[in-house]
Structure formats: C-alpha cells, structure tokens
Amino acid sequence: ASDVYKRQLLCCFENNILIEIPFFAELNFLKQALFELQKQSYSPVLAHPERYVSLSGETEIKDLKLRGAKLQLNALSLIGYYGKDVKKKANEWLKKGFYDFIGTDAHNEYHLSELQKLRLGKKELKEWMNIKISQQRLIGL
C-alpha cells in the first residue's frame, strides 16, 4: 500500500473522509483509492463526482455506490458554474438520489455570491432536503 494510505487521516463522523482525485483520473485509479481507504476502515466520500471526466454515466456512479463510496454534491455545479455538462449531470444525479452530502466548495466570497443563483425544482429540492436532514442527523444537530 502507498504511504498515503498508511498515514493517519483526519476524519469526522463515522470515519467519513472527504477525498478528491484529479479531474481526468482513470476510473480504476479511483476504485483502487476507495479500496485502499476502506481497508483502513475509512468511509470515503467523493467530492464533486459530477466534475470527473471518468464518471460520465449512471453505470459508473452506481458501481461506486455499490463499492461503498458516498458522494458529495458541489452546490456550484447546480448553477452551471463548471459548465452545462456538469450542471446536467449534477441535476440528474440529485434527482435520482445518488448524493449523500452537499458542499459548497466555496473558496471565496465570489463563490458564495454565485450560490445565490441556485434555483431547484420540486424533485431536486426534495432530494436536497433529504440530504440535509441526513447530514444533520450524522453530526447530531
């Protein structure tokens, strides 16, 4: 195993660990990373999967979910901040209930101001609220 997997990592709430991979990484790289982290009793949460090139369809997402991966939606993806294709994937995957967490990925005030453009349909809003409730339970709110 790589030295990265041997180091102690900072986790919160049920050994969840947020991971990010290069946007053009091969799917096998991601699967191996998930496997190595799970061997160490971590519960990987993949940040903004809608932005990864190798995760282009539902088949890949369903496979990752079956492998125990959790997914974190980047809220900026829903407004088209990263392009139309990413927005389309994010909205479809939100409607289908693939996400376990929602994050802003806001690194500055501009990102936060962009989030004010967010508008959700009924189905997306329902899934958003389900995720929010699950997150609150997880952290004890």
Residue ranges of each PLM-predicted region?
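Short acidic/histidine-rich active-site segments
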Residues: 99-114
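Mid-to-C-terminal alpha-helical segments outside catalytic/metal-binding sites
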Residues: 116-141
